[in-house]
Each structure stands twice: as C-alpha cells, then as structure tokens.
Swiss-Prot record:
Reaction catalysed by this enzyme: myo-inositol(out) + 2 Na(+)(out) = myo-inositol(in) + 2 Na(+)(in); 1D-chiro-inositol(out) + 2 Na(+)(out) = 1D-chiro-inositol(in) + 2 Na(+)(in); D-glucose(out) + 2 Na(+)(out) = D-glucose(in) + 2 Na(+)(in); D-xylose(out) + 2 Na(+)(out) = D-xylose(in) + 2 Na(+)(in)
UniProt-recorded name of the protein: Sodium/myo-inositol cotransporter 2
Notes on activation and inhibition: MI transport activity inhibited by D-chiro-inositol (DCI), phlorizin (Pz) and sodium (Na(+)). Insulin increases D-chiro-inositol uptake.
Subcellular locations according to the entry: Membrane; Apical cell membrane
Gene Ontology CC terms: apical plasma membrane; plasma membrane
Organism from which the protein derives: Mus musculus
Domain of life, per lineage: Eukaryota
Membrane topology field: Multi-pass membrane protein
Extracellular-side segments: 1-27, 89-102, 170-180, 230-272, 330-375, 440-446, 501-521
Length: 673
C-alpha cells in the first residue's frame, strides 16, 4: 500500500497532456451504450404512460409524482457535470471549504418544502414569475424575472454544464467536441420534447442511481490509493508540482484546506460570507428557481413534496465525500498536472494558463479505474450532464410558454401552447450549440467558484423580492420592482467589472479596483441583499397598500385563508388550467389564465389526427402528445379548495426526519469548521 501513496511522475512524452492517449476500451463503450439504451427506454416508458396532451400534464407531470422520483430529480437537477468537475477541482485547489455550498443547500431545500411550497400551493401557481404577477399585480416584475431566468439558464447553467461535460467527452473519447455535444443535446432534447416533465423526472431518478453508484466506486478507489482519510491529510500538504518555483507561493496548498470556516478578511471563502452571503443565493436557487420548484409542484401532495425534499437533503451530504475529497486525492496522485503552478506548463497540460484543477475528477476516472468501470463513470458524467440539461430545457420552456408567450397571446389555445413549448426547446438547443465557442474561450481556473460568483451578483435581489413578498404583507409592486431593478443594476455593474478586470494569475500583480479586489463576492451578496431589502421596505411603506386579492393565500400568514368564491361561470366559459394538490382541474376563479379552446371549433387549433394525415405526421403528433383523433368533452369543473392539511402520522414522521437531517448537517458543520 505504501507504493500507492507515491505521486506518479508525468508521462514520458513530448507533451504534458493530462490525458496521454487514453481511449475507451470495447467494454467501456458497451457500458456507455447500455446506459443510453436504459435512458431511452425509461424516457419512452414515461412518455407512453404520462398524459402529455395538456399543459399541466406536460409541464407539471400531471401533479401526481410520489416522493422518491421528486427527490431524485431535485438532486439530479442540482448535481450536474459542473458539480463533478467544479467541486473536485476546487477541492484540489483550495480544500473542503467549497463543500459549504452543499451543506448550505441542505437547509435551503428543506426550507422549500416546509416554508415556501405551502405558499405556492395555496396560491396555485405553476411558475415563479406567475407568483410575483399574482402577488404584486401588473406584468413588469414577472416579465423582468422571466427574461432574467432565461438569461441565467442559457448563459450560465447550460454553458457551464456543457463545458464541464466537454472536458470528459473530448479528452477521454477523443471525439470532436461539436459532434459529441450535438449528439448529447439531440438525445436530451428528444425525450424532453416528447415526454415533458414526467419523462425528465423519471430519467432523473434513473440517472441519480447511476451517478451515486459510479461516484461511490471512484471514492473507494481514491481513498484506497492514498491510504484513507489520514493518508489524504498527511499527503495533501506535500502535493506540489515538481516544476514550481521555490521562491513563489503559487501552487502551495492552503494551510486551512481541511476547514470550512476561514479567515474573514484574507481567505478565499470568509466565514461571515458563508453564513450570510451564501444563504441568500442558496434560497434563490432552492426556493424560487423554476428548475427546482417545478419538481416539487409536480408532487401529488404536500407530504410527498416534503419527502422529496428530505431525500434530496440527505443526498446533499454526499458531495463532500463523493466529489470534494476525491478532488483532493487527485492532487496528491497527480501533482504535476492537477496542481501545476506555471502558466506555460498549465497551458500544455490542459490548455488553460489559469490552472488545471478542473481536470482532477476526469484524471481519477481515466487513471485509476479499470476497463468497464471507466465506462460506468463516463456514463455517470453523461448522466449528470443530461439530467441538468433536461431540467433546464423543460423549465425554460415552461417559463417562456407560461409567462412570455401567454402574455403576448393571452387567448392562445392549449394546442398552441404545447407546440410553442416544444419548439422553444429546440431553440434552446440551437443557442446552446452556438454558445460553445464562448464557453471554451471563457473557462476559468475554478469552474465552481466562477458559477457561485456570478450567482452572487444576480440572484440576491430576486431572492429578497420573493422573501418580502412571502413574509411581509405590506410589500407592494412599486417597492418590489424598485428593489429588484436597483439590485440587478448594482449586480450587473459588479459582474461587468469582474469581466473587465479579470483576476490576475498568482505570479502577476493585482491592480484591480478596490471594489473588485477587496470586496469578496459573498460580501457583495450581503451588501446587495441589504440594499434590495431597504429599497423594498422604504418604497412599499410610502406607497399604497396591496389589495386583499394580492395577499390572500399568497403569503405565509394568509396561506390558510378560504378561496374566494365567485359567481358561477356560464357553461360556455372555457376551462382554465390550475395546479392542485391531487391533480384535479380547478375552477377558473382560482386558476392561472391559460385558456383552452374546444379543438373542434377551429381548424387553427386542429382536430387531432384525422384519416387524411400520413403515417409520418401521425408519428410526429404522437411524439408531441397530440395524437387524439376525437374530441373529448370537457369535464365539469367544480370549485376545489386546495388543502394544505396532512395526515398527522405522516406529518410527524416527516418533521422528525427533518430534525434528524438538520442535526446531521450541523454535526458536519461543527466537525469540519
């Protein structure tokens, strides 16, 4: 075992490439192909069994998901390929402090189910911009948020996941980057378009199992290679590149590498920023981001939504052990590549002069694992990439259809909404492919830190508007919009400054302005949150009070108010889509305004599949869930009051589990603090 602790020398070749002519064996290819067959089979199965010909069936999986696929989908949507690459890379570079994001997310996902979700369910909303529209009135806040969400999805989430996945695909398979990405995006878009949210959730559940199995196997190989946790602690601080300058501090491991809480002024992640500045973006992601909330809204009732959040919370403990520690092991085993400190050497190793820590996880996969298991881990990375992309595609399509297209065409038929939602997925695929060169040109030394810094500039104002809307009844539209715009403008200024004044390399002087150099992005998150809060409170206090309709069942304190009863609609009134606890259709008075039109009354809406259609057309219509060939009379809509009540025994079990989960997180915080 002693020999396993000795760092291997760089490969003897003309280049210091991190992946010297590694290729997939036939067994690896077989495992990868088997994975794709499983994914397509699950996607097809969920496509066939799910009602996809209604807006609710397509975008909210019919509202009848049980807790375990919801929890698996929450975890898989969060842990994409960017997590595997980014967390392991940051672990190799600076130690375990980056795991604070995962432990912080554990609390936030529980907040979603126990605090925010009851408000969303009581208000019967399907998208987050819609909640703001109903809570504050008007359209400018919801439209601003819809555009901002699409911007974040396209230019940060999709680009980051594609770059991270490309590191694996391009280097391990030696495929052309564009060919590999186009193939993945095509398969991903196919079952997203065909099956809607149900297909996404079921494939996420499958991919969560694959990810966990593969990650546990690699963790075992990693710890075995360094002699366990004690061996890692002893050897990490000795993991230095052989070609680094003795007179430079560049490339040295941090002395506080095994601590989460670090110096408030000089560290990479100051502890006040972790406790406060990190929590606000975390609340935005887990409690107001469409990708996450949409999965919880698909649960059949509040208890199943809580169970899903609990499952995801328990799984959030794992990234520290499955990703961060293996990243640190990779530095120990391959210091000349993973811990390279000279820009020219790093350029030769990974084509990135800023550093090569992001190759830590792929390096372990390709160097430690035997044939077959290497293919399994390749499937894990593909699973992580595809699960994230499917989540983003479906949620972005929902926002565009529900909040933007429905605003442009308020009387659009349900069939039109379904077609627009599917076409938008393909538009996202096209934009994603065109964005690949930008991703390649803007890669950073630590991918995960890049993601979090961008989040800290754009997400706090949105989070504060949601928090104030949910917990202060006096918050009105003018206050929320003023705080949102001011916060976003300040965040965009800091974001632009970060791009203009890029962080210098370790061997270069830091001449950036003080606001960029001396104000950590987590501290800026705190400043941004406080500024938005003061603006919202001040403007709301000196302007009109919100009407009762904008408060009833839309805040924490009014969530149990009875649903306002309206006069019965005439028989010819079109039915409207609603979200309920049990998947039933709600009355128009409490629904979001997505009107359906009887398809038999107009050719514009179509008659389903008529005998005149060819087999090709019928196949396409079946794929898109529009294959009905006869009109089904709409069922009579009865007023239904959405209940937040739970079975007392189930509620007690969930609450006890929540306390246990929080206790585990607090223990880990204290142990590694």
């Amino acid at each position: 075992m002693e020999s396993a602790t000795i760092s291997p020398q760089p490969p003897q070749s003309d280049s210091l490439e991190a992946f010297p002519q590694k290729s997939m064996e036939p067994a690896d290819i077989a495992v990868l192909v088997l994975y794709f067959l499983f994914v397509l089979a699950v996607g097809l199965w969920s496509t066939v069994r799910t009602k996809r010909d209604t807006v609710k069936g397509y975008f909210l999986a019919g509202g009848d998901m049980v807790w375990w696929p919801v929890g698996a989908s929450l975890f898989a949507s969060n842990v994409g390929s960017g997590h595997f690459i980014g967390l392991a890379g940051s672990g190799a570079a600076v130690g375990i402090s980056v795991a604070a994001y995962e432990l912080n997310g554990l609390f936030s996902v529980l907040m979603l189910a126990w605090v925010f979700l009851p408000i969303y369910i009581a208000g019967q909303v399907t998208t987050m911009p819609e909640y703001l529209r109903r809570r504050f009135g008007g359209n400018r806040i919801s439209i601003t948020l819809a555009v901002l969400y699409l911007f974040i999805y396209i230019f940060t989430k999709i680009s980051v996941d594609m770059y991270a996945g490309a590191i694996f695909i391009q280097q391990s398979l030696h495929l052309d980057l564009y060919l590999a990405i186009v193939g993945l995006l095509a398969i991903t878009a196919l079952y997203t378009v065909a099956g809607g949210l149900a297909a996404v959730i079921y494939t996420d559940a499958l991919q969560t199992v694959i990810m966990l199995i593969g990650a546990f196997i690699l963790m075992g190989y990693s710890f075995a290679a360094v002699g366990g946790m004690e061996g890692l602690k002893d050897q990490y601080f000795l993991a230095l590149a052989s070609n680094r300058s003795e007179n430079s501090s560049c490339g040295l491991p941090r002395e506080d590498a095994f601590h989460i809480f670090r110096d408030p002024l000089t560290s990479d992640l100051p502890w006040p920023g972790i406790l406060f500045g990190m929590s606000i973006p975390s609340l935005w992601y887990w409690c107001t981001d469409q990708v996450i909330v949409q999965r919880s809204l698909a649960a059949k009732n509040l208890s199943h939504a809580k169970g899903g959040s609990l499952m995801a919370a328990y799984l959030k403990v794992l990234p520290l052990f499955l990703m961060v520690f293996p990243g640190m092991v990779s530095r120990v085993l391959f210091p000349d590549q993973v811990a390279c400190a000279h820009p020219d050497i790093c350029q030769r190793v990974c084509s990135n002069p800023s550093g090569c820590s992001d190759i830590a996880y792929p390096k372990l996969v390709l160097e430690l694992l035997p044939t077959g298991l290497r293919g399994l881990m390749m499937a894990v990375m593909v699973a992580a990439l595809m699960s994230s992309l499917t989540s983003i595609f479906n949620s972005a399509s929902t926002i565009f259809t529900m909040d933007l297209w429905n605003h442009i065409r308020p009387r659009a038929s349900e069939r039109e909404l379904m077609i627009v939602g599917r076409i938008f997925v393909f538009a996202l695929v096209l934009v994603s492919i065109l964005w690949i060169p930008i991703v390649q040109a803007s890669q950073g030394g630590q991918l995960f830190i890049y993601i979090q810094s961008i989040s800290s500039y754009l997400q706090p104002p949105v989070a504060m508007v949601f928090i104030m809307g949910c917990f202060w009844k006096r918050t009105n539209e003018k206050g929320a919009f003023s705080g949102l715009i001011l916060g976003l403008l300040l965040g965009l200024v800091r974001l632009i400054l970060d791009f203009v004044y890029a962080q210098p390399r370790c061997d270069q002087p830091d001449d950036r302005p003080a606001v960029v150099k001396d104000v950590h992005y987590l501290y800026f998150s705190m400043i941004l949150s406080f500024t938005t809060l003061i603006t919202v409170v001040t403007v709301s206090w000196f302007t009109e009070t919100p009407s009762k309709e904008m408060v009833s069942r839309l805040t924490w304190f009014t969530r149990h108010e009875p649903v306002a009863q309206k006069d019965s609609a005439p028989p010819e009134t079109p039915l409207s889509l609603t979200l309920s606890q049990n998947g039933t259709t709600e009355a128009p008075g409490t629904s979001i305004q997505l009107e359906t039109v009887q398809e038999s009354t107009t050719k514009a809406c179509g008659d389903g599949v008529s005998p005149r259609h060819s087999k090709v057309v019928r196949a396409i219509l079946w794929l898109c869930g529009m294959e009905k060939n006869k009109e089904e009379p709409p069922s009579k809509a009865e007023p239904v009051i959405v209940s937040l009540e739970e079975n007392p025994l189930v509620k007690t079990l969930l609450d006890v589990n929540c306390i246990v989960c929080i206790s585990c997180a607090i223990f880990l915080w204290g142990y590694f603090a």
